[in-house]
């Protein structure tokens, strides 16, 4: 009798556990395998767990990492072959400790930079302390990397270490050569085996920044005014940036808010932009700076992307940049600066994607970069990646929750 009672208890416990299992079926409608692609579901999907901690497992029973985002989504990586389905399970349990892949922070010690990264690439944008110096840096910057672990924080700490900076300053008085050698040994502008910062932004749109267009002139944004980090790993970094008022068609109180997120495994940030107090529909452009005259770019409004290969550096290789648009854009083209503007901006022009911003709406697109020393040996490989990324946006993974 005791044995039967024990079996009944076990069966009851198993049934209760099964009642709390959430099955997530992912379907890949595209002709491309999707590997470790971050998928999201609403937190309502786990309501039956009644607040219990949970684990997510794949079809082999192995745990997969997940993150609960600021906007109450559960995100996790999925792998599913073209045209197939795969099922993941969510159930009560204690999740394993997973490595942080996507992360970032503000660096007040480096004129308020906000910098972020994942396992593929890193970026930064500029803050109010830089704007106060008068230096012109409008667009998004790229930091290339060739290691999967986070390295941006270490680069800043090494470059800006007060003791090292003081030693360099002293050496400059007595031994300029030694001072230079020490400065180079800690500089993030030199590759010490994990990548570097050698992309130039200046007074341009840099690596895929957007701006309003008035009478064919770009109303360049400057540095952010306020920032708020909304997500900080392990799988997604999200930052909200609010900018100083712009003057647009006589209105001097147009305020841009920019939300940027970067997921693990992706070369591309997601940008969501709004303009408050804008009175009427206004052209908006997303641009990639052309540092030199070049034909090594693609601009395809029909397929919804622009992509560009920056001039190759003989030591550091080549940086590739792109922007991809889930909604239809009006035009995609290269625009060359006038001679005067070339001199002012230190560049040849932009590859631009042109759209229209309607007041009260949001403008969403993806922009990012790759490096010839970390996965993209030539521009052809980069353009292939961008084309597939654009196509995958049109054929998103579908999610069924049971």
Predicted region positions:
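Solvent-exposed beta-strand/loop surfaces of large extracellular or lumenal domains
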Residues: 51-74, 247-251, 292-307, 332-343
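Acidic, contiguous internal or C-terminal segments within carbohydrate-active enzymes
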Residues: 225, 229-231, 238-284
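Bacterial Sec-dependent N-terminal signal peptides
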Residues: 1-25
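Polysaccharide-binding surfaces and accessory modules of carbohydrate-active proteins
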Residues: 19-22, 283-336
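Alpha-mannosidase-like glycoside hydrolase catalytic domains involved in N-glycan trimming
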Residues: 19-105, 110-111, 136-139, 144-145, ...
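Short, hydrophobic/aromatic-enriched beta-strand segments in well-ordered soluble domains
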Residues: 84-95, 239-243, 286, 322-323, ...
């Amino acid at each position: 009798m005791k044995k039967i009672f024990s079996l009944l208890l076990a069966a009851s416990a198993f049934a209760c556990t099964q009642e709390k299992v959430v099955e997530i079926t992912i379907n890949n409608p595209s002709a491309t395998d999707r590997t470790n692609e971050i998928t999201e579901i609403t937190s309502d999907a786990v309501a039956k767990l009644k607040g219990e901690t949970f684990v997510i497992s794949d079809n082999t029973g192995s745990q997969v990492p997940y993150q609960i985002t600021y906007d109450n989504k559960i995100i996790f990586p999925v792998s599913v072959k073209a045209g197939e389905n795969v099922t993941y399970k969510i159930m009560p349990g204690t999740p394993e400790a997973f490595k942080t892949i996507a992360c970032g922070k503000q660096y007040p010690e480096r004129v308020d930079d906000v910098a972020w990264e994942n396992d593929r690439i890193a970026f930064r944008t500029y803050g109010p302390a830089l704007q106060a110096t008068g230096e012109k840096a409008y667009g998004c910057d790229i930091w290339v990397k060739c290691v999967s672990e986070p390295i941006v924080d270490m680069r800043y700490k090494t470059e800006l270490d007060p003791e090292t900076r003081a030693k360099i300053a002293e050496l400059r008085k007595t031994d300029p050569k030694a001072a230079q050698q020490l400065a180079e040994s800690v500089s993030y502008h030199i590759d010490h085996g994990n990548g570097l910062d050698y992309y130039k932004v200046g007074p341009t749109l840099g690596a895929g920044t957007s701006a309003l267009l008035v009478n064919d002139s770009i109303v360049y944004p400057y540095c952010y005014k306020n920032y708020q980090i909304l997500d900080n790993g392990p799988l997604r970094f999200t930052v909200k940036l609010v900018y100083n008022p712009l003057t647009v068609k006589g209105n001097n109180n147009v305020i841009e808010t920019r939300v940027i997120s970067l997921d693990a495994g992706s070369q591309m940030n997601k940008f969501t932009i709004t303009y408050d107090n804008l009175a009427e529909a206004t052209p908006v452009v997303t641009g990639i700076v052309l540092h030199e005259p070049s034909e090594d770019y693609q601009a395809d409004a029909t397929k919804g992307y622009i992509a560009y290969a920056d001039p190759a550096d003989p030591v550091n290789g080549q940086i590739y940049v792109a922007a991809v648009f889930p909604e239809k854009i009006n035009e995609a083209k290269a625009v060359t600066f006038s001679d005067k503007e070339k001199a002012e901006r230190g560049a040849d022009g932009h590859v631009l994607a042109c759209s229209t911003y309607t007041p009260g709406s949001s403008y969403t697109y993806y922009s990012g970069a790759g490096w010839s020393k970390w996965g993209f040996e030539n521009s052809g490989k980069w353009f292939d990646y961008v084309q597939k990324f654009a196509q995958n946006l049109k054929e998103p993974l579908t999610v069924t929750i049971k």
